[in-house]
Structures are given as structure tokens and as C-alpha cells.
């Protein structure tokens, strides 16, 4: 991972004007039947940026437009910021262009207070502004005996990508790595995307969830409904369980898939926090609900909206969606 210096990105000017206008009026006549409207926010973006990072060396292309009641994303999934070294010993995949095409409602509606779980490659839970996918869970699993695989394991214990040192998925400074398909994706805080968007200390809209609600990174108002209150790092409402679940493996006995596979007797302790099941949701413990979101005012939505938050602590990013997909 290169942490000593930041390699500059060269910005290629398009013949089409690039825009990040949050007050575009082309959808001002849209009458939403849902709970909220996002019609005039970030619906006129068209960017092409050359990323000369040694692990990328490609154009990052992404566009956000609207049509009727839909927000439309097209892009190539190439990050528009510095990344770590890929391939690397714990993530042997190179970044490559993807064909990203997705639609999101401009009129999101909450249909489940508990949230609907979204895990796996069939549906992206969210996309960042630069068309890079948010995919917080992993395919890594362990069985009760401690036999684990980082690549589609068969056990019932779900391995977390972040927050521990037992399993290394080769993630970089953006808490991201690369799938075998070449798709670079975020598991947590996209640090250099936030820097690119220009607001490391502000309330930064970094993407959109598949149900149409916005995604913000790290910060929010101390009083959710008061834009004059202090900006604070928002806290999730999850904590480590005081006791491990029955039959939870405590020692890694074999690594049978993924980087490092074939290590038959590693005998490495598996601390609490390595598995998704090690955490529990406690309503009101932090600022956010079970889907790592809340209702409140934001710079883009001064009247208030439900929004998800990327956090520094588990679950890092929502694992469920409250709106209709």
C-alpha cells in the first residue's frame, strides 16, 4: 500500500460540461407519490477523469442523469482516486473496467422499519458517486470446527472484512479491494473519495442506496433535525456481544480457500469481532438505526430525509435497506 505520497490524478476536460449541480430544475415538475423526493439533487453529472495510479491507469467514467421518476447511473466502476496496490498477496485481482448501469427511484419510500437484508453479488446495496459499488459483506465463511475460506466458504460464520486482523482481504486505505471479476468495491469508509469530493470535515453525500435514499460519510448533525447544531462523527448502534454464540469457533484450524489456502494448521485465535454474528444491535445505543441510517436534515435535503451513513465502526455500511428496491 502506498501511503508515503499521493500520486496526482490528471483531470481530462470533456467537450460536454461536467456538473455537480444540486439544484438542477429539469425534474422540478416531478410529483412524487413516495415519502420523499430526491429529484433535484445530483442528477446532472458527467465526468471522465484519468487515474494514473499504478494499479489503475485508466479513465474513471461516470454519469448521473434522470428520466421520469428514475435516477440513472452509468459508469465503468473505475475509482477516481488513489488506491492501494492490486494485485497484492491477500487480494490477487487486478482492477478492470466494469459495465455499470443502474436505476434508482427519485421518490424513495420506506416500506420496512426493520429493513430488508441485502447481501451478495445479485444486487448492489449502493453505488458511490464515482460508480464504484458498496459491498460491505464478504463471501468468507468458517464452520464450527474453525475451517475457514475467504472465497465462498461453506460454514455458517460470516467473516467480516474490516475491524480485525485474523483474516486479511487485502483491502486498501479506502477500505476497498477487488473482486475476481476486477470490480473494485468499498467495504467501508471511502477515504480518498471523500477527499476528492472536497469535504473531509463536512456532511458529504458519497452515493445512493439501491432504494433511492442518499448515503453520507461519517459526519452528521448532533441534532438530527437541526442544521445549526455541531457536526459530529455519527455512531452506529451495534456492539460486540458479551459472550460468543454457541459453537462459535475460537481458533482458525484450516484455511481452505482464498489467499493463503492450504494452511492446514495455523492455530490462530479468532477474536470477537471477526464474524458478523459477534455483534448485536441495541436500539438507541448510538445515533443510527439497525440499517445504519436515520431521518434528519442534510445540506442537500434541508427539509429532512432518511439517509444511510458510512461509519468508522461496525457495521461500517448498512447491510439492509428500508426502502423499496
For every predicted segment, state its role.
Residues 2-11:
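Sec-dependent signal peptide recognition
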Residues 14-17:
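C-terminal motif of bacterial Sec signal peptides marking the signal peptidase cleavage site
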Residues 19-21:
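Bacterial signal peptide processing site
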Residues 23-168:
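Solvent-exposed N-terminal domain segments of exported/luminal and surface proteins
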Residues 99-101, 122-124, 171, 181-185, ...:
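Extracellular structured ligand-interaction cores
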Residues 129-175, 261-294:
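Short, flexible domain-boundary/linker segments around small modular repeats
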Residues 129-132, 180-193, 301-315:
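Extracellular/lumenal glycan-associated surfaces
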Residues 213, 227-325:
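Extended, compositionally biased non-globular segments
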